[in-house]
Amino acid sequence: MANVAVVGSQWGDEGKGKIVDWLSERADVVVRFQGGHNAGHTLVIDGVTYKLSLLPSGIVRKGKLSILGNGVVLDPWAFAKEVDEIASKGVAVTPDNLKIAENAVLILPVHRELDEMREGANSGVKIGTTKRGIGPAYEDKAGRRAIRVIDLADPSTLTIKVEGLLAHHNALRRGNRLEELEAGPIVEALKEIAPRVLPFVAPVWNVLDEAKRKGQRILFEGAQGTMLDVDHGTYPFVTSSNTVAGQAAGGSGVGPGAIGFVLGITKAYTTRVGEGPFPTELTDEVGQRLGERGHEFGTVTGRKRRCGWFDAVMVRQAIKTGGITGIALTKLDVLDGFDEIKVCTSYEIDGKLVDHLPAGMDAQAKVTPIYETLEGWKDSTQGARSWAQLPAAAVKYVRYVEELIEAPVALLSTSPERDDTILMKDPFED
């Protein structure tokens, strides 16, 4: 029995929600280990649609323990709203099925304001954030001035801690000609929301240690994608946390040996939302067709996603930096009906072939994709549940992807329905 970490291998939106839901049915514990409520995913269970941004996917399944780890940044008001929303659909969220790490950092209104101000500025690089305060909250964590979940349990020291936080933020606000903030209203707002959060607080490292000792299956649920990792992604057009599988250990309080299989969720083509380099982006009718067929709109923001052909160079790099054991290839059915399908096999920069995405922003902007063209297929792959149901050209495409990215396809998804999945390798099995 192996514990499993699920991460995206592209720029997010790879279809992690369906795969995590498929795996969570067999897991005992589901853990979010990074990010915040900027990572939306949609689940459809028994005809009911759930749109989650913060809570782990396991929360909608009875008998599962869900955990928000210390690597998560938690907006307590967004948390309460999401709990209420799924409660209205019959899902009970209690301290028995959800634990929040006591050392997780809180997102405050001041973080959201700073995020919005930066994105709205006329100068500088626009990152394309969700403006939900994720980045500024991580900044305060690194600066050792953040308010953490456990601080809600001690109102007597909350004022001093908020004042320390505001000493930094008010300096920023003065520089941007914004009104300075007083600690009082923030402290009162935190005291008011605290009862919605504190019942769930626990030393989750200890909870996970007990789960391991009992031999329970643990599923670590990543958000965003490897190419949005603050270190390994297309910096500065990245998120503010580490999204690679290595963060599953540090972001939840377990050792790296607790993770047995890393499943990289990989879309059969490529999409990106927001700003940043995108070597295989298609702005023609082919890109539009991919977007329409794949319903490529963000769960959190509703923004239209940019679309392009599969980038094997980028995914291969993500597999190596992300420690990915095998991939789940999703949305293969979106490619149905194309006469030909292109795959990026290498890059060219200033006339030289390159086998990886360079770290520098200027070099990334110069990348030209080199394509291999494959025969498409007319027969539908939608709903296929075995290799025998796939057109020969589709099988050839999958095998070619495996060869290029140097990793096996462990699962193949052929529709948004959870049962339309072809299993080659069970990630939970040693």
Swiss-Prot record:
Stored SUPFAM superfamilies: P-loop containing nucleoside triphosphate hydrolases (SSF52540)
Enzyme Commission code(s) on record: 6.3.4.4
Function per UniProt: Plays an important role in the de novo pathway of purine nucleotide biosynthesis. Catalyzes the first committed step in the biosynthesis of AMP from IMP.
Protein name, per record: Adenylosuccinate synthetase
Any single Gene Ontology cellular-component annotation: cytoplasm
UniProt-annotated binding residues for IMP: D13, E14, G15, K16, N38, A39, G40, H41, T130, R144, Q224, T239, R303
Positions of Mg(2+) binding: D13, G40
Pathway: Purine metabolism; AMP biosynthesis via de novo pathway; AMP from IMP: step 1/2
Cofactor stoichiometry and binding remark: Binds 1 Mg(2+) ion per subunit.
Source domain of life: Bacteria
Gene Ontology biological process terms in this record: 'de novo' AMP biosynthetic process; IMP metabolic process
Family according to the record: Belongs to the adenylosuccinate synthetase family.
